[in-house]
């Protein structure tokens, strides 16, 4: 396992953290009956992103290139939705959005390296 593979595993666990965060957000803000400042479809977006995050986690470990593409696509989607549809800094300093943005920047900056240098896979048969 080289440095790119180790970093890819770390990145994969970042998506698990994201999935757990999305579940926490949905529970804390009303689950299916959320009427907060975000759009009414927000809970369904979070549930969907939660599942996608887990798929990205698995693909980063099992099929590195598929995982890298999915991680970039997921971060582009999550950042666009979060920066345009949800209250950003209206209710104070939004550390969650800044953390998500930082994670997205890390994904974007490391994608070329991970694409070319990742070799290790979870299963040698994959």
Indicate where each model-derived feature is located.
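Topology signature of small-to-medium multi-pass alpha-helical membrane proteins
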Residues: 1-126
């Amino acid at each position: 396992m080289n440095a790119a593979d180790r970093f890819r595993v770390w990145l994969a666990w970042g998506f698990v953290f994201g999935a757990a965060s999305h579940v926490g957000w949905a529970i804390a803000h009303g689950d299916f009956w959320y009427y907060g400042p975000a759009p009414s479809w927000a809970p369904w977006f979070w549930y969907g992103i939660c599942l996608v995050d887990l798929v990205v986690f698995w693909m980063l470990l099992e099929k590195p290139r598929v995982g890298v593409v999915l991680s970039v696509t997921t971060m582009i989607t999550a950042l666009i939705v979060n920066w345009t549809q949800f209250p950003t800094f209206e209710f104070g300093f939004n550390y969650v959005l800044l953390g998500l943005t930082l994670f997205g920047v890390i994904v974007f900056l490391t994608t070329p390296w991970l694409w070319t240098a990742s070799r290790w896979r979870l299963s040698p048969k994959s």
